[in-house]
Design a protein with these regions (language model features):
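Short, conserved active-site entrance elements at the starts or edges of catalytic domains
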Residues: 42-80, 99-105
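Residues at the C-termini of beta-strands that transition into short coil/loop
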Residues: 26, 67, 152
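An acidic-aromatic
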Residues: 1-46
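Gly/Pro-enriched, hydrophobic low-complexity segments
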Residues: 8, 72-168
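Generic beta-strand structural signal
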Residues: 13, 16-17, 20, 61, 65, 75-77, 93, 125, ...
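Short, solvent-exposed mixed-charge patches
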Residues: 171-172
Length: 172
């Protein structure tokens, strides 16, 4: 759940994914709340599994190396792979650190491939693991930036947090 304390009336935005099904609650959008499907579901799966880099080969196939590039004055190694249902993703790793600094994924839609980009930064050590504390999520018509204040590893999390948002559950 993502709150917006500086925007009264915006309410919280919720994105959840339980490993099979995903949901979106965005209060100021036309749809408001809905179960994600198609390439949007593929994107939710990819976003979740990239939190655990060891799972990259399970979610992306046909991995290939692309020519190096520079992002924000950082030299990057670039890897691209295919996801499910003709989606694909391009991953940008900073050469000097090996850290993922950008992920672009492309999902199919009736009007063609739609890009989504996530930029990762402000990496800090969390129990011996470098974790991004800032990420910017950009898509065709919008952008959200998130700054985390704390990350805790291996703590119990209520399984309901990964399921259908409460407000959707109540509307059944």
């Amino acid at each position: 759940m993502i709150g917006f304390p500086d925007a009264p009336g915006r309410d919280a935005s919720v994105r959840s994914y339980d490993g099979k099904i995903g949901w979106m609650k965005t209060p100021l959008s036309v749809l408001g709340e809905y179960q994600v499907s198609g390439s949007e579901l593929d994107g939710a799966r990819l976003d979740a599994q990239l939190s655990f880099p060891a799972q990259m080969k399970q979610v992306l196939t046909n991995l290939r190396s692309l020519p190096s590039d520079t992002i924000d004055d950082k030299n990057c190694d670039i890897i691209q792979g295919n996801g499910s249902r003709r989606t694909f993703a391009t991953l940008y790793f900073e050469k000097s650190t090996g850290l993922l600094i950008r992920m672009k994924r492309y999902g199919n839609s009736p009007i063609g491939r739609l890009p989504t980009q996530i930029d990762y930064s402000d990496y800090r050590d969390v129990d011996g693991i470098k974790m991004p504390f800032r990420f910017t999520f950009s898509w065709l018509d919008g952008r959200d930036a998130f700054q985390l204040s704390e990350i805790k590893l291996n703590v119990p999390v209520d399984a309901a947090k990964f399921g259908r948002p409460t407000s959707l559950e109540q509307k059944r």
